[in-house]
Amino acid sequence: MFSIFILTHNEELDIAACIESAVLCDDVIVVDSFSSDRTLEIAQRYPAVRTFQHAFESHGKQRTWMLQTIPTKYDWAYILEADERMTPALFAECTAAAKASEHVGYYVAERVMFMDRWIKHSTQYPRYQLRLLDKAHVWFDDYGHTEREVVNGSAGFLKETYPHYTCGKGFSRWIEKHNRYSTDEAKETIKQLSEGTIDWRALIGGKTEVERRHALKDFSLRIPGRPLVRFIYMYFFLGGCLDGRAGFTWCVLQAFYEYLILLKVWELKNHPVAPAELSKSEVTEHTTSDISTTLPNNQHPTCSKAM
């Protein structure tokens, strides 16, 4: 068996459905980044679910912190985000994989659900994320707005997939979120162009989709006209045109996101606006409690902050 972590921040529209998709697990833990909506209240309605709060620094740090700090019933854990769902078939395969322990982590492919349909082609399906892991052998580093896994051992791939409702809270929320993401991606772009390298071996002959995708990401940062190139690649070469109106909209939004990143790169180089000041003010709201946990008996033990 394995535990399930659910990462949240202002997820009142998704958290109930996410938790209910994970009910086959007897150790579900919600890790909330101090939501300002009803996320925590809704999660606490489920007696078997434990809830923790921890101030968000980055995706990599949040994952590593929860894996190293929060006690779990099992050595193995699955990382689930609020706009994703566990399925019975995936749960069964994860249970078998954790029991066999042939690897220290397993990648799972997502099915991007957008505008009421599965976007199969332009999302690079099957696109794998490391989700099932032995907590003692996996942690995460930051990369752009997201994270990259560090695996101390071998990793395998599961056959079952999970649905990811990327725009379930509406286009306004999607645009707001990617506006924030683009700032981190712009910083990563500047860093990679200055210090990074391209792994040509992985780009040309990588053994796994994950290797090839990471190398392609690093390579794409150096391509002129990235927004247009990305649209052409996704819509025509990957087959986004086969996904109908939703596929076209998805490709346009991804090209817009790339253009927003380039605008932020230009801004950071020519007119830096010190966005870190806002981040610091948001973080200091919670300096009085690095972590709080709500259990069924309403006790509030504290844990020392990791990292």
Language model regions located:
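Active-site nucleotide-sugar/metal-binding loop of Leloir-type enzymes
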Residues: T64-W76
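A conserved acidic beta->alpha catalytic loop
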Residues: E12, S21, D32-E41, F56, ...
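Acidic helix N-cap motif at the loop->helix transition within catalytic regions
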Residues: A16, D37-R45, A89
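Short, well-formed alpha-helical segments that are part of the catalytic scaffolds
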Residues: F5-L24
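Catalytic-site signature of metal-activated, phosphate-bearing donor transferases
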Residues: K61-L67, T87-K269, S304-M307
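Short acidic donor-binding/metal-coordinating loop in glycosyltransferase active sites
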Residues: S33, H54-F56, Y74, E81-E84, ...
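Cell-envelope/extracellular polymer assembly enzymes that use nucleotide-activated donors
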Residues: M1-S3
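Compositionally biased, intrinsically disordered low-complexity segments enriched in Pro/Arg/Gln/His
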Residues: P296-P301
